[in-house]
Amino acid sequence: MGHNGSWISPNASEPHNASGAEAAGVNRSALGEFGEAQLYRQFTTTVQVVIFIGSLLGNFMVLWSTCRTTVFKSVTNRFIKNLACSGICASLVCVPFDIILSTSPHCCWWIYTMLFCKVVKFLHKVFCSVTILSFPAIALDRYYSVLYPLERKISDAKSRELVMYIWAHAVVASVPVFAVTNVADIYATSTCTEVWSNSLGHLVYVLVYNITTVIVPVVVVFLFLILIRRALSASQKKKVIIAALRTPQNTISIPYASQREAELHATLLSMVMVFILCSVPYATLVVYQTVLNVPDTSVFLLLTAVWLPKVSLLANPVLFLTVNKSVRKCLIGTLVQLHHRYSRRNVVSTGSGMAEASLEPSIRSGSQLLEMFHIGQQQIFKPTEDEEESEAKYIGSADFQAKEIFSTCLEGEQGPQFAPSAPPLSTVDSVSQVAPAAPVEPETFPDKYSLQFGFGPFELPPQWLSETRNSKKRLLPPLGNTPEELIQTKVPKVGRVERKMSRNNKVSIFPKVDS
C-alpha cells in the first residue's frame, strides 16, 4: 500500500506539474516576445533618428542646390523646391513625435490630449499629401519638356497655380481628421484614441483619401513615364526620316531627351518606387484595422508601419543629389571651395605666428593675394636650362670684355699701341644688344634689390630685375642695370650705303665696309 500510494501520488501530481510547466513556458514565451519587441522598438527609434537628421540635411542641400545653380528650368526648380519643403516640414512635424511614441508608448501624456492629437494628425496628413502630389507635377513637367522642348507648356504663373492647388488639395483632404479622431496616416500610425471606432464614415474617408491622394497620383506618374518612354522610342524613326529627306517639317514635333532629362526621369522613377515599397506595411495595417476590423495587430507590424514609410523622406534628397550629374558636380565643387577657403584661413593664421620668427618674403607680404601673385610670377619667369646656360655665357662674355677694356686702359697708360678696329655693328644688332655694364665690387655698391621682399605696390616686378633681363619671357625690352646706362649707351653709326645697277636693271644695296 505504501508502495502503491507512493506510486499513485506521483501520478496524481502530474497534472499539476504539467499545468505549472505550461504556465512557465507561456511566461517564457511572453518574456521572449516582450524582449524582442523592446529590442525592435530600440531599433526603430535609432532608425528614425537617423532618418530625421539625414532628411533635414538632404532636403536643405536640395533647396540650396536649386537656389544656387540654374541647372534646371524655373518650373522644374519650383516643383523640386516644393518637394524638398514638404520633406522638411514632414521631418520636423512627424518624425519627432513618432520617435517619442516608439521609445515609450506611455510617456508624454500631453501627446494623447484630443486637441493636440488632432492638430498633429492634420499636419501629418497635409505634408504627406503634398509629398505625394508633387510627384505627378514633376512628371507632367518632364512630359512637356521632352515632347515640346522648344515650347513652354507650363509657364511660371501656371506652375505657381499648380503648387497652390497641391497645397489646397492636401489641406482639403486632411480636414476630416478633426472629425474622425482615430485616423492613421502614412508617416504616423499612432491613433488619437485607443479603441477603434468601426464607423462607416471612417471607412469612407480612408477609401476616398487613399484613392484621390495616394493611388491616383502614383498611377498618373507611371502613365506619364510610360508616355515619355513611348514617345522617345517612336522619335527615332522620325529622326531617321527627316534626316533622309533633309526637309524639316514644322508640324512634326520630335521629342528630345538629353542626359539631364534621363537623369531626372531615373530620379523620379526611383523616388516613386521607393515610396511604394516603403508604404506596403502601412497599406497592410490600414487593411487590417479598417477593412478586416482586426483590433489586435502585431507590435512588429505597427512599428514597421511607423518607421519604414519615413525612409522615403531620406531617399528623395539622396536620389536627387546622387543621380543627377550636374547637381553632384555643383555640390562637390562647393565642398572643394569650402575646403580651400578653410585651408587658406589656417595658412594665414599660422603664417602670422611664423612672421615673428622668420622674415620670409611670402609671410611678410601682408596679403594672401599678393603672396599668391608673387609665387605665380616666380613660376612663370623661372628660367629654363637653356636660358640659364645662355645667361651664364652672357655673364662670362661680359667679364671677358671688361677684362679686355681694363687691359687696354693699362696699355694706354704705358704707351700707344695700335689695335685692330672691330667691325661696325648694324642697326638691328645695336638695338638687340646693350652695352655691358662695368663690373662693380659688391663691397662698395651692394645689390639694390637685396632689400626687396616681394612684389608689392612700391616694388619692381621680378621680370624687370637685372637677373632676368635676358629671359625670353620678359615683358619689356632688355635694359641695363640702371636707366643712366641706357641713356649713356651710344648706337654706332652705320656706314654709307652704295647702290649699284645690274644688267637686269635690279638695284643692289651693298653696305660700305671699311677696309
From Swiss-Prot:
Keyword Oxidoreductase part of the UniProt annotation: no
Residue span of region Disordered: 1-20
Gene Ontology molecular function terms on file: G protein-coupled receptor activity
Bias (Polar residues) ranges: 1-16
Main location: membrane
Cytoplasmic side of membrane: 64-82, 140-160, 229-267, 321-515
An example Gene Ontology biological process: circadian behavior
Pfam families in the record: 7tm_1
Membrane-protein topology: Multi-pass membrane protein
Keywords: Biological rhythms, Cell membrane, G-protein coupled receptor, Glycoprotein, Membrane, Receptor, Transducer, Transmembrane, Transmembrane helix
Family per similarity comment: Belongs to the G-protein coupled receptor 1 family.
Name this polypeptide is given: G-protein coupled receptor 176
